[in-house]
Amino acid sequence: HPIQNYRISSSFGSPTLWDTVSRYCQKSKIRLPSLRRILIAGAPVPGTLLKRFEFILEPDCKVLTPYGATEALPVTSIERQEIVDDTLARSEKGEGTCVGKPVPGAELKIIRISDEPIPKWEEGLEIPKGQIGEIIVKAPWVTKTYFNREDVTRLTKIPDGKTFWHRMGDVGKWDKQNRLWFCGRKCHRVIIGLETLFTIPCEAIFNQHTDVKRSALVGKSSNREPVIIIEPENKDRVAKDREIFTKELLELGAAHPHTRSIKKILFYPDFPVDVRHNAKIFREKLAAWAESQ
């Protein structure tokens, strides 16, 4: 009602907020013609949400999904229509979430993944286009240090002459159009022998199931066993036919090379998420729970 009563033209919100609003509007056949610009950030934006906007917004309303962090915002941006027309189908097949091209003034690189401090920038750190690596950014608005946290500053900043690169703590890759594809948090990757599984590409496969609200990849047994935890859209289904539901999900995973090694499915009624955006999944809490299952 405030959007309609005050004829709001611009809005910023998390994917969870807009998922709730858009579901209500579609169900109640409500359109929001005053909106001209919407920014959605805080977590990857589901394709189902972007498609739903077609039913409630005017065609000229721009829906932007910028990518960034507290230390560096914005970094890249992409508009809804480009996602729906060009990248969404690839995201659903597990390529990651396309977050667009760097904004003016920001320089991005993809480097080989490391959990250690990098003492200085070297050209050999960068990896070829198309490979998943660690995302780093250089821009005038990026924070230089963490207050009284020299250890964190050393771990997240790469000196480069008189400037520096900031390590986003995320993994991703470039496509042929020089767009960035987000593949999850670096610390959430699951390493099994010579194979590394990344959260966003893996979860996208299981999220295609109509009875899945969202999913989370975690590692059990000291990160050696990959597990997909499902928050069901229909909680009754888990109670009634858990075995068939699990079989359907495992078949989905087996159909794609990057999820073929996932053999364990668990169900969790309501995922723990961050208070601010109500969208970031606390995978660490889910991983701790999975250890006891």
How should these model regions be labeled?
Residues 190, 216-218, 250-293:
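Conserved C-terminal "lid"/linker of ANL adenylate-forming enzymes
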Residues 196, 209-214, 232-269:
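Conserved C-terminal helical docking segment of ANL/AMP-forming enzymes
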